[in-house]
Amino acid sequence: MHIKRSIEKIPGGMMLVPLFLGALCHTFAPGAGKYFGSFTNGLISGTVPILAVWFFCMGASIRLSATGTVLRKSGTLVVTKIAVAWVVAAVASRILPENGVEVGFFAGLSTLALVAAMDMTNGGLYASIMQQYGTKEESGAFVLMSLESGPLMTMVILGTAGIASFEPHVFVGAVLPFLVGFALGNLDPELRDFFSRAVQTLIPFFAFALGNTIDLSVIGQTGLLGVLLGISVIIITGIPLIVADKVLGGGDGTAGIAASSSAGAAVATPVLIAEMVPAFKPVAPAATTLVATSVIVTSVLVPIITAMWSKRVKGGDGTVPKEDAVEEKAEQQRRRIIK
């Protein structure tokens, strides 16, 4: 049976399928973890410790060395995405109720959901798109996008926008596993190779644990709203990203569209923030489902829109010839001249 292959046909499947299975478990057998106890309960309720290991391994996978072009491109995209999320947070906090919208079509929508959906880019999706439609430097720009993974940027945005307050030691606690992994991975390439292998492996485990915090009735209530949120993420973050890529990044806007997605890791953010600030606990389940839907929507639409944009600005099929293809073509031309 090709279970893995089938799951990967779904955009973000390795995150979303276990998430849905966890939600099924929580909805129809909410006491399963306590009933079985031991390791089973650990898998069901271990969101935070599993994510802590994942953040450590994510940090270890990042290389310190990068060219100036890569850093400029990735820095431009990351800063722009965070800045847009901050503006959205500042505006939403003055419009939406403190506990989110509780009735009507927009029930479940909260400032936390908006920020979590918008402040992180799906680095893997970006890299795969830009390998086809961008240069080598552009596809390598996801190097700094990994720094967005985790609740730190969301904490910074919520804190600086005056929506929540976090003690300094809480900030340190949120980023410390990532920094320790980052340090070890750059001190020893073998450790980087060893720990980076676990990044993809751990995703289904923390997704299943996250799912066990969600009731399926919440998914039913927020499904269409989540689709609208995903489209909004592409529009609201995509336009500034295109402008920033052209003006500051030296690109043609393709990288900006490719970065206008919701990251799979963002699905975990509402629960993690709620663990630190209990005031967010009432809105965390709905925010989680909204962000999960946004991940699906952006994972499907962003590659399509990026391809259309690239064809418009580059012509042809929109792809960029790779170095080996360019060299081969040049060699063929030299041979014709010699003949």
Curated annotation (Swiss-Prot):
Membrane topology of the entry: Multi-pass membrane protein
Broad class of the protein's primary localization: membrane
Upregulating conditions: Repressed by the HTH-type transcriptional regulator KdgR. Induced by galacturonate and polygalacturonate, but not by external 2-keto-3-deoxygluconate.
Region described as Disordered: 315-339
NCBIfam families for the chain: kdgT
Entry similarity comment: Belongs to the KdgT transporter family.
Name of the protein in its database record: 2-keto-3-deoxygluconate permease
Underlying gene: kdgT
